[in-house]
Structure formats: C-alpha cells, structure tokens
A protein has these predicted regions:
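Extracellular glycan-associated modules
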Residues: 126, 406-721
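Extended surface/linker regions that mediate inter-domain or inter-protein docking
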Residues: 219-357, 363-364, 368, 517, ...
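N-terminal secretory signal peptides that target proteins for export/translocation
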Residues: 1-7
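Bacterial N-terminal signal peptides
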Residues: 13-22
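Solvent-exposed helix-loop boundary motif
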Residues: 25-167, 171-172, 188-193, 203-205, ...
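Active-site histidine-acidic residue metal-binding/catalytic motifs
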Residues: 26-31, 110-112, 253, 274, ...
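Extracellular/periplasmic catalytic domains that process cell-envelope and extracellular macromolecules
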Residues: 67-68, 91-95, 105, 122, ...
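Primarily short, surface-exposed interaction patches in extracytoplasmic proteins
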Residues: 157-193, 197-232, 246-293, 354, ...
Length: 827
C-alpha cells in the first residue's frame, strides 16, 4: 500500500511539472481543456492518440505534400522545414507556445485549423495535443512502419482459456476494459463457425451429429484438418483473394467485353489447397516469369498483374491507357502487399503518408517494362501481350514432337545445301545459260502485278479501276487517285482521300507461307510512323496480317497475329531518301522467325534491326470478328495511323515465293545481267548464283523445304485453337520511366529508376531492379509491412474484420489496430 501511495504522489508531481511547462507558454488554458486533460491517459502515445488527430485535421496543409504545405510547417515529422530566412531547424517544442495559442484561439484569423477548412478540433483533441506537447512532443515512426515488437509468452501466459497465445492478448484487452469473455460456444455453434470459416459453406447434418456426440478437442482438430484438406477451402480463400486482385469476368469501361482469367483463378485455388508458402504465393504472382526455371504454372500466376480494366473503345490513345495499366498495377501492389493507398501519390506527394510522387513512379518503374502497347486486341483467339499459351499435357507432347521433327528436317536441309556443290558447278559452268534460266524463273511465283499505268473512272467519277499486269487478275479499286510520273510510267500518289484496295484474295498469305513483295515508293518528306500499305486488320485487332510503315523514314515491316507480342518485325538501320523514287523488295521465308524477313533497297540487302521474333499463330483474316470488315491489301488512310500523304507508290509485284538476291538485283535493274555479260565478272556474283540454284533448282532441297513447310502448317493447326492468358513478360530493353505531371501520360518530367519508398525500407542495391527484386524486397525480414498486412488480411478472411479494420490502408488515415500487440505477435 505504501508503494502504491508513493507511486501516486510521484505521478501527481509529474503532472504538475507538465502543466508548469505548458503554462510557461501561455497564461491560462480554457477550463474545458483542463478538464479534458484530466480525463486523458497518464501517458499520451503519439501513434495511437496524437497522430490520428494530426493526420485527419492537419496533414492536408502541414504534412508530406510539399506543394500544398502552408507556412512552411510540417507536423508529420519531428522538425519544421528549414526557414526561408535562415538555416535554423525548429522542432514542435520550439514553437509550442504559438501552436497552443492557435489551437485554443477564438479568433477566426488566428485559429487552427481555420474555419474554412471545415474540420475543427474538439476539446478532447485539443487537450490531447497540448498534453503531448507538455510531455515533450516526442515523435515515433508510424506504427506500421516500425519493426514488430514480439512479446515472448511464458507458459503462465499461455495457460489462460484454451492455452494459445492469441487468448493471452484477448484476455489482457478484455480485463483492461472490464469485459468478461463470452461463454463457451455450443458444439453446434462451433462446427457451424468452423465450416463457414474454412469452407464458406454450412456443415452437413452428418458432420453436425457426429461432432455433437463427440465434441472433444481431438474431434475439433480432426474437423479442422478435414476442412483444410477440402477443395472448398481453396475456393473460399481464392474468392477473397480475387477481390484483392480486382478479378472480373469482363474488361470494364464502355464496351465491357467478356474475358476469361479463370486459369489464374484456378492457380490461386490450387495454391491455397497445396498450402503454398506466402512468399512463394506472392513472388509467383509478381514475378513468376522471372524466377529461375519458370514454367507454365509460375508464368500463369503473373496474370495477377494483368487483371486491371482494359479499354477497347475505338478512339483511345494507346499510351494513355498503357500508363493507366501501369498505375493500376502499382496501386494494387500498394493495397495488396503494403496496405498503403499509393494512388494519392500518382498526381502529387501523398498528403498523409511519407510517399512522394517520385516514390510512386519509382515503384511504377518495376511494372513499366511489360511488353505491351496499351491496345485492347480483342479479336478471336487474340489477347494483348504478353500472353501465355495454355497448352494441355497432350498438346505439349504433340508440339514437342513436331518441333523435334522440324529441327531434324532443318538439319537435313543444311546438310543437303552443303552437298549440292557438284550439281551447282555443272550448272554454273555455262553462265549465259544460267542467266537465261534465272530471268525466266524470276517470273515464276508472280501472283499479282499492278503497274498503276491505266486508270478508268467509274460511274460516280470519284472511284477508279487500275488494270492488273497479269491475265485473269481483277483490277485494283482506287478512290480519288492522284496520278503523277512514276518509277517507270505513271505512279499512284496518296492524298487525304485516296484509298487503293486490291481484290481481297490477292496477297493473302499465312505465316507459314513464303512470299515476296516488290514495289517502288516516293516519300515526299519526313514521316512519323505512317502506314504505307497494309494487308492486315486494324491495330485494335492486333494488326493481324502484314504491313509496312515509314518510321522517321526508316522502313518497318511487320507480320503479326497480335502485335507486338505474337509478331515478327524488322526495321532498316538507314532512312530512305525523300523526293525521289526508291525500289523496295521484302522477302519472307514462312518460318515464323524475324531472321527469315529481309528488306532490299535499290536491289541491295539493307542492314536491319530485328525484333519480336515470335510468330506462332495464323495471320489470316477471320470473317467472324465483330462488325469489322477486311479490305485486303490497302494503300491510303488507315485506322489509328498517320497516312503516307503525298507519297508515291508504283510497280507492285507480289510473289508466292522467296526471291533470291540475284533475282532482286535483276528486278531492280533489268540491265544487271547485260552488264555481267559485258564485263565478264560472273565470278564476283558466284555466291548469289549458288543461292538461286539451291533455293530453286535443287529438287531434293525443294522436297525437304516442302516437307518442312508442311510440318510448320501442322504445328500452326495445333497451336491456333489453344487459348491464351494475359501474363507478364518484360522487354529486353528497359522502357524509361518518368514522373508524370499530375499523372498525365503526355507530360513526363524527371526520369526515375526502380526503387522503393525509403520511409518503409530502402531497396537493397544487391537486388535485381525488376519485379523479382521487388518481391524479394517485400520479404526482407526488415520490411515492417508485409507480414502485418497479410496477417491482418487473414484475420479479416476468417473473422470478417481485420485487427485493423482498414485492411488495405495501414497508413496514417487507416484505422488503428484494436490489438496492436497481437498483430505484432502474429506477424
């Protein structure tokens, strides 16, 4: 008793000292404030008593957001910002008198928060802040940013109630607030609670009867094991996780088209039923494509990052929505794994939490390197890349078998090409005869020729026909042609209204078909990503087909199923000149690789940059797509692309074979062979003669090539109907990330690089600066948030409400945990 009295006297003494300290700054506090101070706990805790008030009523003007900060005063950290007039740094204790004056003032011009803020402090809140100042105004890191402090429980602590550690913390809180625990639940209630908690379904009557008749602890544990091993357990847990991951069966936005992410959903169900560890569960969803020996299942998990809404409206700007998708991934990462509202920092520094706008875009850079363009790509069997082929085991076996056959056949072809020297030398021994054969053979495989020399007006005077240069070939249809001097005679020029379309069956090739295109073009200036021609669908449907662009006057040719992920692409290293005619030839060998694509400029092979290099499905037009038609080979205005305005086009030839270099040299200059004969320099071109012979005149090689192409077609038939799932996959070359002014995609500012908010935990420089490194950062033992967020979410899953009720927000604006010690102990 004597000790208690001494302790009480000591507290009274401290309390008096506290008020002497406060009153030294102000003559007298209002009586109502003093009364409220007397009702407060002996010690006011910054995180649990003071910070919620400051966050709600003060941080908007005196918090982390430097652009909105008033009076150069910060109340979210233990110092005032450096004064504009001197280098002095002031703490709250240094300005305590002014702060208390403003909190208690009745003068509207003096009072804080100001009346027009419409969030005033009540007397208890003012008293809390004043008492905290009197105690020394000590700041502490935000409760969720500090390392969990784990209480080591003794056997005596665990002896309460059922004997587990959770009950110790519950009992401690109930005793503190003077509440007795509820009576023990009946067996009927227990089994019902357990069944709903672990299966989401009521127990069966048989299970209820069996448990009522034997309600022992052993029987209860057996029920737990039974329910945890039930497939329903994974379904229940996945259902809750799907909400975290923003799962939906449609795209959202205006069109709201159907989509199928059920393979990812099934992966989540299996992960819970297999009791996958949480670090693996998260790492596979964030970066399953980047882990060592990534397989179909680990890549499938990354669909988590592609569950954002997807816009397929006609007028969207792709980069705008690509930026939206990156922001969505970043925001979801924050809410799902950090319990933070990162979206506030997309446009400005967070007003309540220490997350700057730069922090947001540094985090976003982890998700900004995905191989995507922002296009919807919603044609049948198409999806915006990156995507994963969802092959069955049987399909995998068939694909593997065909690929092995293709590899074997390719080796045979290489061997045969090397061994054909004897036949070639015999043919080469008579060069003039060989030249005649080349000239004659060049016309083989020519399936279309349009010289654009003759134009015949139709009834309305605006539409014209241009006759083909081959018998039996229908003429080209042209709207408002501009006719000028061409490569040979006349040429077709393009204005805003010019549209040229070939008959729909002309130039129709699949990705397994070899073909060549020869033509001349006259660029009239510099072109930024202008489409010269296209035998393809709209970019919204993946540029399905083939197309030619001028990108800063470099030639870019694309063959695609769904561009850019299911496509091959080449671009010349040099530009082609403007203001003059240039002869162009494009060849493709039908093998689905960028290495089989080549561009020739004025008869010479052009150095090119190859990309994409994965073309694994058919590029043929599907007539059942939505309401859009297919116009075949077209020149003129194209959807979503700049037009080849004022540009000329002439002498179009289409071949159903790969033209060899010597054939292309002859097509470019019909005097080529005459000069060879005159100058007798055949030997200089012997390799070109040999290539022609091997590709066209060696019957054994032709048979092997036909066998190879047949296998390729069979492989495409197997792969074509296989569904695909949107997943993650990074570009080989990192995409630059910038802070976006007010979050606007078209207003980049400072360039930033992959990093994490320093207020949470610095990013270890040893970690890879990609999504895998980000996942490893999440599970760093020093990370204060990861475990807390997941424990709180699991608690919510089973009890309906988390230990802190704002499961996705453990920041300053989030609810405080009801049982902070329990949350830390479980974490």
């Amino acid at each position: 008793m004597e000790k208690y009295c001494l302790h009480k006297k000591y507290l009274v003494f401290c309390f008096l000292i506290c008020f002497i300290f406060i009153f030294s700054c102000q003559e007298k506090l209002p009586t109502v404030i003093v009364e409220n101070i007397n009702k407060l706990p002996e010690t006011v805790d910054f995180n649990f008593h003071v910070k919620p008030i400051l966050s709600d009523k003060c941080f908007a003007c005196h918090g982390p957001d430097s652009k909105k900060r008033k009076a150069n005063l910060r109340l979210d950290i233990d110092k005032r910002a450096i004064s504009k007039t001197n280098e002095e740094t002031l703490t709250i204790k240094d300005i305590k008198s002014s702060l208390i004056d403003r909190l208690t003032s009745d003068d509207p011009a003096m009072k804080m928060p100001p009346p027009d803020f419409h969030l005033s402090l009540d007397n208890k809140e003012i008293a809390t802040i004043i008492k905290w100042i009197g105690q020394g105004a000590e700041y502490h890191p935000h409760w969720s940013f500090s390392t969990p402090v784990v209480k080591q429980l003794t056997s005596e602590d665990k002896s309460q109630w059922s004997g587990n550690g959770i009950d110790y913390f519950i009992k401690k809180k109930l005793e503190k607030i003077g509440v007795n625990p509820a009576i023990k639940a009946s067996p009927q209630t227990l089994i019902r609670r357990l069944s709903f908690s672990l299966k989401g379904l009521p127990p069966s009557l048989i299970e209820v009867d069996k448990f009522i008749n034997s309600p022992s602890s052993g029987a209860y544990k057996s029920l737990i094991d039974k329910y945890l091993n039930s497939p329903r357990y994974g379904e229940l847990m996945a259902n809750i996780w799907m909400d975290v991951a923003r799962y939906a069966d449609s795209d959202g936005y205006l069109d709201d088209k159907h989509r199928d992410f059920s393979p990812w959903r099934d992966w989540v169900i299996k992960a819970f039923n297999d009791n996958m560890t949480y670090d693996k569960f998260v790492t596979h969803q964030l970066a399953g494509d980047l882990i060592k020996d990534a397989d179909q299942e680990s890549i499938k998990a990354t669909a988590f990052n592609r569950l954002h809404k997807k816009n397929s409206e006609a007028g969207i700007i792709f980069e705008e929505y690509r930026s939206e998708y990156v922001a969505d991934r970043t925001i979801t990462f924050g809410s799902a794994f950090l319990g933070m509202t990162l979206e506030c920092a997309r446009c400005h520094d967070h007003k309540y939490d220490p997350i700057s706008q730069k922090n947001f875009y540094e985090l976003a850079s982890f998700f900004n390197n995905t191989f995507e363009i922002g296009s919807a790509v919603y044609g049948p069997g198409q999806s915006p890349g990156p995507s994963l082929l969802l092959t069955s085991k049987k399909e995998q076996e068939v694909i593997k078998y065909i690929e092995e056959e293709l590899e074997s056949k390719q080796k045979e072809i290489k061997v045969e090409k090397k061994s054909s020297n004897k036949l070639f030398e015999s043919w080469w021994s008579e060069p003039k005869k060989a030249i005649s054969e080349i000239i004659k053979h060049t016309e083989n495989g020519l399936v279309a020729y349009y010289p654009f020399d003759n134009f015949y007006p139709q009834a309305n005077g605006k539409n014209f026909k241009s006759t083909a240069g081959l018998k039996g070939l229908k003429p080209a249809s042209i709207k408002e042609p501009q006719v000028k001097k061409g490569w040979k005679n006349q040429g077709l020029f393009v204005n805003e209204f010019t549209e040229m379309a070939l008959p729909k069956n002309v130039g129709r090739f699949d990705q397994t078909d070899p073909f060549s295109l020869s033509f001349s073009m006259f660029p009239d200036g510099q072109y930024e990503d202008a489409m010269v021609f296209g035998h393809c669908e709209q970019i919204r449907i993946g540029l399905k087909g083939y197309s030619l662009f001028l990108n800063k006057n470099k030639l870019k040719f694309i063959i695609a199923r769904s561009w850019p992920q299911n496509a091959i692409e080449i671009e010349t290293e040099s530009t082609i000149p403007s203001g003059k005619w240039t002869s162009i030839t494009i060849t493709y060998d039908g093998k689905g690789l960028a290495s089989g694509l080549n561009l020739f400029v004025n008869g010479e092979k052009a150095p090119v940059k190859r990309s994409g290099d994965q073309l694994y499905k058919s590029i043929l037009f599907n007539p059942n797509i939505h309401t859009y038609g297919f116009d075949g080979f077209r020149i003129g205005p194209q959807h979503k692309f700049k037009t080849y305005l004022k540009g000329g086009f002439d002498e179009l030839k289409i071949y159903s074979k790969v033209l060899t270099e010597i054939e292309i040299a002859y097509l470019n200059d019909e005097t080529f062979f005459d000069r060879l004969k005159k100058e007798k320099v055949y030997v200089n071109f012997k390799p070109l003669f040999r290539d022609f012979f091997v590709e066209n005149l060696d019957n054994k090689i032709k048979k092997l090539e036909n066998d190879f192409n047949r296998l390729r077609k069979n492989l495409t038939k197997v792969i074509d109907p296989i569904p695909e799932l949107m997943v993650m996959g990074d570009r080989s070359e990192a995409r630059p990330t910038h802070v976006l002014n007010r979050g606007v995609y078209s207003e980049p500012r400072e360039e930033v690089f992959p990093n994490t908010p320093e207020a949470i935990l610095n990013f270890d420089s040893k970690l890879p600066k990609n999504r895998l490194g980000l996942a490893q950062w999440l599970f760093d033992k020093k990370n204060p948030l990861t475990a807390r967020v997941f424990v709180n979410r699991i608690w919510q899953m089973h009890f309906g409400k988390g230990l802190t009720s704002t499961t996705d927000d453990l920041g300053s604006q989030g609810a405080l945990p009801n049982y902070p010690e329990l949350l830390d102990w479980l974490s």
